[in-house]
From Swiss-Prot:
Transmembrane segments: none annotated. Disulfide bonds: none annotated. Keywords: GTP-binding, Magnesium, Metal-binding, Nucleotide-binding. It comes from Homo sapiens (Human). Its cofactor is Mg(2+). SUPFAM superfamilies: P-loop containing nucleoside triphosphate hydrolases. This is GTP-binding protein 8. HAMAP family: GTPase_EngB. GO terms for molecular function: GTP binding; metal ion binding. One of its GO terms (cellular component) is mitochondrion. It comes from the Eukaryota. CDD domains: YihA_EngB. GTP binds at residues 117-124, 146-150, 164-167, 226-229, 261-263.
Length: 284
């Protein structure tokens, strides 16, 4: 299911040298993105398109069941998305409030995206990485699983709201199911749910519960593979193949393309920012 403004390029792989050349010619207003463009090409490729390494392994086999480049943003859109995530006087990025029940949630007119996942999957770390261009925004990160106990709302200018949901599984809040299920079912301005899966261990039983919830409510959602810095290329390839097969055969509402990311190396963060900006209509 494609949201307004989502650019789809079915089956077309990036011509990486051409893309990098276009990126180098693009003048972004984001100083951080300008610094990214000065990286060596191989490092830049890994940072912006982490699935490129997987593509190289799969190309000889002609795997048509994989959807590695459906979301096909232009270099200009990647830079524009970075600008949207950059805090300025005109583009305020702030923590809004927290809530334990949907009727306590702030009534915000903007499009909304939420992040859910198992305890200790790296959810808060990922959100902190997304907001790295707005360093004044405080996203609390803890090494202890189950640190997030409430729904935390962050506004990104006048564009959209990001919601950090409590983790499920170990040390989850007692009212987790009621809290999250009610939010997913009743939040009318929710545009996309981002389901985080640990790339080291893959989809777990508790993840299946969250997936079933999204499917039951007919919600558009996407799987984000976290902690790819802790996975070898071979292990990441194995997880991508297994999860892609699961998405193709077992889901209806899941976006076909996976998004591997690392909150440590920032690999995949720029592309994920662009996807968020796209599904919320912020690039229109």
């Amino acid at each position: 299911m494609a949201a307004p403004g989502l650019r789809l390029g079915a089956g077309r792989l990036f011509e990486m040298p051409a893309v990098l050349e276009r990126l180098s010619r693009y003048n972004s207003t984001s100083q951080a993105f300008a610094e990214v463009l000065r990286l060596p090409k191989q490092q830049l490729r890994k940072l912006l398109y982490p699935l490129q390494e997987v593509e190289r392994f799969l190309a000889p086999y002609g795997r048509q069941d994989l959807h590695l480049r459906i979301f096909d943003p232009s270099p200009e859109d990647i830079a524009r998305a970075d600008n949207i995530f950059t805090a300025t006087e005109r583009n305020r990025i702030d923590y809004v409030s927290s809530a334990v029940r949907i009727d306590h949630a702030p009534d915000l007119p903007r499009p909304e995206v939420c992040f859910i996942g198992r305890s200790n999957v790296g959810k808060s770390s990922l959100i902190k990485a997304l907001f790295s261009l707005a360093p004044e925004v405080e996203v609390r990160v803890s090494k202890k699983p189950g640190h997030t106990k409430k729904m935390n709302f962050f506004k990104v200018g006048k564009h959209f709201t990001v919601v950090d949901m409590p983790g499920y599984g170990f040390r989850a809040p007692e009212d987790f199911v009621d809290m999250v299920e009610t939010y997913l079912k009743e939040r009318r301005n929710l545009k996309r749910t981002f389901l985080l899966v640990d790339s080291v261990v893959g989809i777990q039983k508790t993840d299946n519960i969250a997936i079933e919830m999204c499917e039951e409510f007919a919600l558009p959602y996407v799987i984000v593979l976290t902690k790819i810095d802790k996975s070898s290329k071979g292990h990441l390839l194995k997880q991508v193949l297994q999860i892609q097969k699961f998405v193709n055969m077992k889901t209806q509402g899941c976006f076909p393309q996976l998004f591997p990311v690392s909150a440590v190396t920032f690999s995949g963060i720029h592309l994920l920012r662009c996807f968020i900006a796209s599904v919320t209509g912020s690039l229109d």
